[in-house]
Amino acid sequence: MVHWSAEEKQLITSVWSKVNVEECGAEALARLLIVYPWTQRFFASFGNLSSPTAIMGNPRVRAHGKKVLSSFGEAVKNLDNIKNTYAKLSELHCDKLHVDPENFRLLGDILIIVLASHFARDFTPACQFAWQKLVNVVAHALARKYH
């Protein structure tokens, strides 16, 4: 089990309370698809992903980005039980979708960039440390079924 200090919990929840899930989720998923284009193969049904402009404007990317970040909110609410929080999603991504678990880490790193750009003043090095710890724990929980 991961230990969270009171300061880490406060830094995570403070930033999370300001997050526009729809906007930041769409941006995070779009950035993932643009920066790491091989991840697009998991989203072939999303239609036009031919350019950064097409990806940023794609309504299915926006909708799924919101869904992904909403799910991430469950980690924020359940910091002491992230492994169980993501058990079913881990199974889905492993057994049915066959997503390379490295992509979870990549998305986590992208999320850090999105949060830092949106909340620069709040995103201190201590805050970044807490969020990096969180995205690593989430990525590990999502990859759990693969082990």
Swiss-Prot record:
Coiled coil region boundaries: none
MF GO annotations: heme binding; metal ion binding; oxygen binding; oxygen carrier activity
Source species, domain of life: Eukaryota
GO cellular component: haptoglobin-hemoglobin complex; hemoglobin complex
GO biological process, alphabetically ordered: cellular oxidant detoxification; hydrogen peroxide catabolic process
InterPro entries: Globin (IPR000971), Globin-like_sf (IPR009050), Globin/Proto (IPR012292), Hemoglobin_b (IPR002337), Hemoglobin_oxygen_transport (IPR050056)
Start and end residues of each Globin domain: 3-147
Residue sites binding heme b per the record: H64, H93
Cystine pairings recorded for this chain: none
Keyword annotations from UniProtKB, A to Z: Heme, Iron, Metal-binding, Oxygen transport, Transport
CDD domains: Hb-beta-like
Similarity field: Belongs to the globin family.
Xref: PANTHER family: HEMOGLOBIN FAMILY MEMBER (PTHR11442), HEMOGLOBIN SUBUNIT EPSILON (PTHR11442:SF7)
Oligomeric form and interacting partners: Heterotetramer of two epsilon chains and two alpha chains. Hemoglobin E (Hbe) contains a alpha-A chains while hemoglobin M (Hbm) contains alpha-D chains.
Known function: Beta-type chain found in early embryos.
Protein's name in the database: Hemoglobin subunit epsilon
UniProt lineage: Eukaryota, Metazoa, Chordata, Craniata, Vertebrata
